[in-house]
Regions:
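Short glycine-/acidic-enriched loop or helix-start segments at secondary-structure transitions
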Residues: 49, 72, 135, 172
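N-terminal Rossmann-like FAD-binding beta1-loop-alpha1 element of flavoenzymes
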Residues: 32-62
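Feature captures the FAD/FMN-dependent oxidoreductase FAD-binding
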Residues: 1-3, 103-169
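Glycine-rich FAD pyrophosphate-binding loop
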Residues: 54-78
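Extreme N-terminal leader/targeting segments of oxidoreductases
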Residues: 1-36, 111, 169-172
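A secondary-structure boundary/capping signal
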Residues: 40-43, 65, 126, 158
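Glycine-rich active-site loop/strand segments that organize a redox cofactor
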Residues: 74-111
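Conserved Rossmann-like nucleotide-cofactor binding loop
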Residues: 45, 68, 168
């Protein structure tokens, strides 16, 4: 992890204080900050870039309009498998298990996406859509409007927006 493995002694001694789960909830909520990078789409490309940026210490939020990470794959035709062999589809930092089939079934891959996001501690909002994005040249920041599952909207100001919404999807 190139020296990025965190060492947290505080939670071991303060049994009534915040623990890892509390800190993850706060990190994912983005209540008091904006991400440096907003990644639109949380499948292969989106999760991979979020993992790479996170390992570099870049505060990154990935969003996906699906209810669960991987649902874009779960909804596809029943017998779908990847058309490329497992060995060329590994994710950064966590290769697929050696016991996996050569051609990964869609549901297995979708479940991996969820597992990967959790294991890599990626900040992901599901059931969230990008409604609008405008770039402010003077501030060198984007203004993005995100629509959450409950219908609420959230305005954020990331420095960068990365579109990973798939080869068949066009931004609106």
């Amino acid at each position: 992890a190139n020296g990025r493995r965190w060492q947290d002694v505080d939670w071991k001694r303060n049994f009534g204080g915040e623990n890892w789960a509390d800190r993850r909830r706060q990190a994912i909520a983005y209540e008091d900050r904006d991400p440096a990078v907003l990644v639109v789409g949380a499948a292969q490309a989106g999760l991979m870039i979020a993992a790479r940026l996170s390992m570099l210490g870049v505060d990154t939020l990935a969003i996906d309009r699906e209810k669960r990470i991987g649902d874009s794959w779960r909804r596809r035709y029943h017998a779908l498998t990847l058309h490329n062999e497992t060995r060329v589809n590994h994710f950064p930092y966590m290769p697929f298990p050696r016991s996996w089939p050569v051609l990964i079934p869609k549901d297995m891959l979708a479940n991996w996406f969820e597992f990967y996001a959790e294991a890599m501690e990626l900040n992901v909002w599901t059931a969230t859509e990008l409604v609008a994005a405008t770039y402010d040249e003077s501030a060198k920041r984007w203004t993005v409007i995100l629509k959450r599952a409950d219908g609420s909207e959230r305005i954020m100001h990331p420095r960068h927006v990365v579109f990973c919404n798939g080869v068949s999807t066009l931004p609106k």
